Amino acid sequence: MKVTIYTDGAARGNPDGPGGYGTILSYIDSTGVEHIREYSGGYKKTTNNRMELMAAIVGLEALTKPCVVTLYSDSQYVVKAFNEHWLDGWIKKGWKRGKNEPVKNVDLWKRLLAAKNQHDVTFCWVKGHDGHPQNERCDVLATTAADGGNLADDNVVE
């Protein structure tokens, strides 16, 4: 099945403020009917990058069988990690980057890799806040979650 996932993350007072993610999952079933699911959640203290990662994770983890996925994100951090093979280098170096510095958000990168490996995923960058309807909707989901009262603890903030 072909699935399209749109994602966005937001953080207020980055890096130690509340944050949220928004994800839209869209597919057309065998009868030609389009299905759209929206997901969002918020955390008390987090970063924008962690929320961008969570948005992608939630979208991929929502899939119950292997799919061909096109995932759109306005996060160059997420998209370039795959498309420019940053992740390959980080893994080869034992989750180190550049001058032997530890990679941030390793817990979420590992979770995203595990979710991605179940599918054939293409990561595509979309310019944020540029009128792309699904990206704008994900932004609303993410910021609403960040501003909400039901925020979870993000136990790893780097």
From Swiss-Prot:
Q: Where in the cell is it found?
A: Cytoplasm
**Entry's EC annotation:** 3.1.26.4
Question: Which positions bind Mg(2+) 2?
Answer: D8, D139
A Gene Ontology molecular function term of the record: nucleic acid binding
SUPFAM superfamilies attached here? Ribonuclease H-like
Which CDD domains does the UniProt entry name for this protein?
A: RNase_HI_prokaryote_like
Q: What is its main location?
A: cytoplasm
Residues in RNase H type-1 domain copies: 1-147
Catalysed transformations (reactions): Endonucleolytic cleavage to 5'-phosphomonoester
Gene Ontology process terms (BP): DNA replication, removal of RNA primer
Q: Which keywords label this protein?
A: Cytoplasm, Endonuclease, Hydrolase, Magnesium, Metal-binding, Nuclease
Cofactor comment in the record? Answer: Binds 1 Mg(2+) ion per subunit. May bind a second metal ion at a regulatory site, or after substrate binding.
Positions binding Mg(2+) 1 in this chain are D8, E52, D74
Any Gene Ontology CC annotation: cytoplasm
UniProt cross-references to Pfam families, sorted A to Z: RNase_H (PF00075)
InterPro entries recorded for this chain?
Answer: RNase_H (IPR050092), RNaseH-like_sf (IPR012337), RNaseH_domain (IPR002156), RNaseH_sf (IPR036397), RNaseHI (IPR022892)
Known cofactor(s):
Mg(2+)
Query: Per the similarity annotation, which family is this?
Result: Belongs to the RNase H family.
Its biological function? Endonuclease that specifically degrades the RNA of RNA-DNA hybrids.
Q: Which HAMAP family match?
A: RNase_H
Q: Which NCBIfam families match?
A: PRK00203.1
Q: How does it assemble?
A: Monomer.
Official protein name in the record: Ribonuclease H
Q: Which organism is it from?
A: Lachnoclostridium phytofermentans (strain ATCC 700394 / DSM 18823 / ISDg)
In the UniProt record, what gene is named as encoding this protein?
Answer: rnhA
